[in-house]
Design a protein with these regions (language model features):
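Residue-level signal for the nucleotide or nucleotide-sugar donor/cofactor binding architecture
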Residues: 16, 77-83, 110, 175
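Conserved SDR Rossmann-fold cofactor-binding beta-strand/turn motif
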Residues: 41-42
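Glycine/proline-rich active-site loop of Rossmann-fold NAD(P)-dependent oxidoreductases
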Residues: 31-35, 47-60, 92-102
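Conserved sequence/active-site signature of Rossmann-fold short-chain dehydrogenase/reductase
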Residues: 45-47, 85
């Protein structure tokens, strides 16, 4: 499915990604398909970074692991490891069947309370133990810039079907999201960003 760029609740990042992809497909069509074209749309990309720059997605894991987010808010995202995104790109280049296809990638959708539980089970004891309902999270968003950005997504159940197409056409086999979450938190800890 495509994001609706005219929807007033869509954030600028998602809108720009949607418009850029549509422009690319329009170009391919207008030019008579001058080359192979495949689109890979990963969900929230987490996992070990090659540098000390965590990136925005890994900062979400940091917020939960450090307790900066003192309660788990009702946010659900698809999670995919950066190493699995790289593998999907390589597979797409190797498999002719990927031409003209769009692949939405995530290993699974998880609520923040589930992410917090995974982190606590792996020694990150500052991860929140309590969850708040949607109405409370929307009130809290007035006091937190990070939550305010996520306001359109609070309480929203994801309905994207991610992996089956990539698994079937590419032979893509992502690692469990839980493994990626822990690897991310461990790297952040090793960088001294989790005490």
């Amino acid at each position: 499915d495509w994001s609706d760029p005219e929807n007033p609740s869509i954030d600028h990042y998602s809108k720009s990604k949607t418009l850029a992809e549509k422009a690319a497909w329009d170009f391919i069509e207008a030019e008579g398909k001058p080359f192979e074209f495949t689109v890979i749309n990963p969900a929230l990309v987490i996992g070990p970074s090659l540098s000390n720059d965590l990136g925005e997605s890994n900062k979400a894991i940091q917020m939960v692991a450090t307790g900066k987010m003192p309660v788990a808010v009702p946010l659900q995202f698809g999670y995919v490891d950066v190493r699995d995104v790289a593998a999907a790109h390589i597979l797409a280049m190797q498999k002719p069947a990927s031409d003209g296809e769009r692949f939405a990638l995530a290993e699974k959708d998880m609520w923040y309370e589930d992410v917090a539980k995974v982190l606590r089970e792996n020694g990150f004891n500052k991860a929140p133990k309590l969850s708040v309902p949607v109405w409370a999270a929307k009130i809290l968003a007035n006091f937190s810039p990070e939550l305010k950005m996520a306001l359109p997504y609070i309480g929203r159940v994801r309905s994207v079907k991610y992996t089956s197409k990539a698994k079937d056409l590419l032979g893509w086999n992502p690692r469990p999201a839980e493994e990626s979450i822990v690897a991310t938190a461990n790297q952040i800890k090793d960088l001294g960003l989790i005490k």
